[in-house]
């Protein structure tokens, strides 16, 4: 229930799960303490904020050695446009999830940012035409 509505009141949550408000509060606190709940955040409309284009970018590094990978990971951390970065197994090294205003903005981002990231040898871009499913809820 908290995944679907992180702002649900303790009283409403207690009613939904048929427990006392005190028991629910204790359980939620325990979930925080034990690291099951990492935090709460607002879901924003990217289009309204000038970030309507979602792209996924495959990154192939010139060398997969620790110093190159560490430099790449550090550089990715400071770019707000890069929402996610995953080291993957397969035909490339990293998969990035990037949000920008539009294709013109992405072209600029690709030329000025992506190619200046440490160790980047090759990129492949996949522009999202339609978000069919977008959730952060885990299947529990």
Task: Give the location of each predicted region.
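A compositional/biophysical signature of low hydrophobicity enriched in polar/charged and small residues
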Residues: 1-140
């Amino acid at each position: 229930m908290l995944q679907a509505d992180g702002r649900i009141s303790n009283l409403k949550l207690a009613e939904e799960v048929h427990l006392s408000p005190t028991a629910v509060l204790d359980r939620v606190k325990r979930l925080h303490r034990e690291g099951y709940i990492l935090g709460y955040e607002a879901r924003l409309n990217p289009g309204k904020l000038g970030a309507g284009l979602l792209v996924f970018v495959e990154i192939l590094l010139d060398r997969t050695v620790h110093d190159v990978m560490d430099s790449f990971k550090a550089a990715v951390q400071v770019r707000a446009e890069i929402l996610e970065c995953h080291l993957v197994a397969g035909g490339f090294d990293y998969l990035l999830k990037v949000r920008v205003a539009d294709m013109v903005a992405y072209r600029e981002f690709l030329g000025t940012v992506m190619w200046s990231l440490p160790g980047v040898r090759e990129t492949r871009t996949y522009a999202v035409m339609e978000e069919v499913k977008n959730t952060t809820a885990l299947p529990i």
